[in-house]
Swiss-Prot record:
The name this protein goes by in its record: Protamine-2
Organism expressing this protein natively: Pan troglodytes (Chimpanzee)
Pfam families documented for this protein: Protamine_P2
UniProt KW keywords: Chromosome, Developmental protein, Differentiation, DNA condensation, DNA-binding, Nucleosome core, Nucleus, Phosphoprotein, Spermatogenesis
One GO BP: spermatid development
Subunit structure: Interacts with TDRP.
Modified-residue entries (Phosphoserine), positions: 8, 10, 37
Taxonomic path: Eukaryota, Metazoa, Chordata, Craniata, Vertebrata
Protein encoded by which gene: PRM2
Length: 102
């Protein structure tokens, strides 16, 4: 899921801020070196910060690939789906524990 911030109609667009930033002298990525005023610092943090996050669920294509590999050998199953996210496994379909080949 990707979360975006909705801009209010009274708020200027990102292009206006970009023009203001490029109009001033730019040093490194520090906010003081760019000469940003306090309200521009807030805008800079909002537009260049890490407020956007992506949540990646197991896609159907990936799940299908995992299930396709499963029937090769029932004993040596590779558990790849959501291995890194063991607590929040609700987004993925859980596989059956028993072998369905018989």
């Amino acid at each position: 899921m990707v979360r975006y911030r909705v801009r209010s109609p009274s708020e200027p667009s990102h292009e206006v801020y970009r023009q203001q930033l490029h109009g001033q002298e730019q040093g490194h990525h520090g906010q003081e070196e760019q000469g940003l005023s306090p309200e521009h610092v807030e805008v800079y943090e909002r537009t260049h910060g890490h407020s956007h996050y992506r949540r990646r669920h197991c896609s159907r294509r990936r799940l299908r690939r995992i299930h396709r590999q499963q029937h090769r050998s029932c004993r040596r199953r590779k558990r790849r789906s959501c291995r890194h996210r063991r607590k929040h496994r609700r987004g993925c379909r859980t596989r059956r524990r028993t072998c369905r080949r018989h």
